[in-house]
From Swiss-Prot:
Pfam families: PIN_5. It catalyses: Endonucleolytic cleavage of RNA, removing 5'-extranucleotides from tRNA precursor. The keyword Hydrolase applies. It is an enzyme of class 3 (hydrolase). The ease to obtain knockout of this gene and the lack of growth phenotypes upon gene deletion suggests that archaeal HARPs do not make a major contribution to global tRNA 5'-end maturation in archaea, but may well exert a specialised, yet unknown function in (t)RNA metabolism. GO terms for biological process: tRNA 5'-leader removal. Disruption phenotype: Deletion mutant shows no growth phenotype under standard conditions or nitrogen deficiency. InterPro entries: RNA_free_RNase_P. This is RNA-free ribonuclease P. RNA-free RNase P that catalyzes the removal of the 5'-leader sequence from pre-tRNA to produce the mature 5'-terminus. Keywords: Endonuclease, Hydrolase, Nuclease, tRNA processing.
Length: 247
């Protein structure tokens, strides 16, 4: 059997949808369970799960610490995930990929600017329709900031993130995950549309984080021990049938 290799993004351990599928409400319990599955897969099948070091490893460590996970979670990360720095200087990526990425980023930046312009116009329009007594300039300014600008800026931030960040590689760890997977000819495990999109561009296998635990369970369900037990049961059943026929 060809040994599988996987490169994990932080979302492979922290994805909310994955926890819901597995029936865990606690982030730490979900991380422990996934890491235990990885441990079994490594011991029974030699499946290797890598994490880019130090970028993604640091993210995982800080995520576990911020959410109050005990030392056992960090110990499992250190034990069962292979820490490896991606070889950024030797992994070849075609110039066409970078050309497409630059064009894609430019389009997203322009869309983000459009959202910002809409927010500014909305704020200006709201201000024009408000009373502005000169003797209450300070109070008026505070009211505008509180009642108008604050709410609009909040909406602007959400729209800007959606317009600019969704579907792009917006961090160094994202790029490290893809480079390491390309280097190792491994599959990427993540819950990130940007990573998924550019994994396809790079010809890297992608596995959604919420299906990864079920994939490992399926491997384990057909493991050598399980197959051997099934063969023993079948052999006993055949022997019993032969004895019955003889009688």
């Amino acid at each position: 059997m060809l040994k599988q290799r996987f490169v994990l993004d932080t979302t492979a351990l922290t994805d909310l949808q994955t926890r819901e599928v597995m029936g865990y409400t606690s982030l730490c319990e979900g991380m422990k369970t996934i890491l235990d599955l990885i441990a079994e897969a490594r011991l029974h099948f030699g499946i290797s799960c890598y994490v880019p070091y130090p970028s993604v490893y640091k993210e995982m460590y800080e995520f576990a610490s911020r959410n109050g996970c005990d030392r056992e979670v960090v110990a499992k990360i250190d034990t069962w995930l292979v820490k490896k720095s991606p070889d950024r200087y030797r992994v070849d990526v075609t110039s066409q990929i970078f050309h497409e990425y630059v064009s894609y980023m430019r389009e997203r930046i322009n869309r983000g600017m459009g959202v910002a312009e809409d927010a500014i116009w909305e704020a200006a329009t709201e201000c024009l329709f408000m009373e502005n007594p000169q003797n209450k300039k300070k109070e008026y300014r505070e009211e505008v900031e509180r009642e108008v600008i604050g709410g609009i800026i909040g909406k602007f931030r959400n729209k800007y993130r959606a317009a600019l960040r969704y579907g792009i590689l917006d961090s160094a760890p994202d790029i490290d995950v893809l480079i390491l997977a390309k280097e190792l000819d491994a599959a990427v495990i993540a819950s990130d549309y940007g990573i998924e999109k550019w994994a396809e561009q790079l010809g890297v296998r992608f596995v959604p984080a919420n299906t990864f635990p079920m994939m490992i369970k399926e491997y384990l369900r057909h493991g050598p021990e399980v197959v051997k037990e099934q063969e023993d049961e079948d052999r006993k059943r055949i022997d019993y049938s032969d004895d019955a026929d003889f009688i």
